Amino acid sequence: MARKSLIQREKKRQRLEQKYHLIRRSSKKEIKKVPSLSEKMEIHGKLQSPPRNSAPTRLHRRCFSTGRPRATYRDFGLSGHILREMLHACLLPGATRSSW
């Protein structure tokens, strides 16, 4: 189980990313439209003004059950060992575990 502080930090990053998403998107569109380099540099400076943790690349996908940051399956939102346990217990409808 991940520490609660790390999970809360990740939630804070998600909130910040949602808050500054439109500002980042509009700044990137402006950079594409402006022909001169000096104006692009000004807009780029504006793009760097939001907090660092509001960047979407800072987000990390975590297991919603344990908070584990690695080996998380996108389709289920679970880490590998929790997914395996849930498949053995038949808690995920429609999913079958391959065995040979």
From Swiss-Prot:
Belongs to the universal ribosomal protein uS14 family. Keywords: Chloroplast, Plastid, Ribonucleoprotein, Ribosomal protein, RNA-binding, rRNA-binding. Residues 28-59 are annotated as: Disordered. GO terms for cellular component: chloroplast; small ribosomal subunit. Coiled coil: none annotated. Part of the 30S ribosomal subunit. The gene is rps14. It is found in: Plastid, Chloroplast. Binds 16S rRNA, required for the assembly of 30S particles. GO terms for biological process: translation. GO terms for molecular function: rRNA binding; structural constituent of ribosome. Residues 28-45 have a biased composition (Basic and acidic residues). This is Small ribosomal subunit protein uS14c.
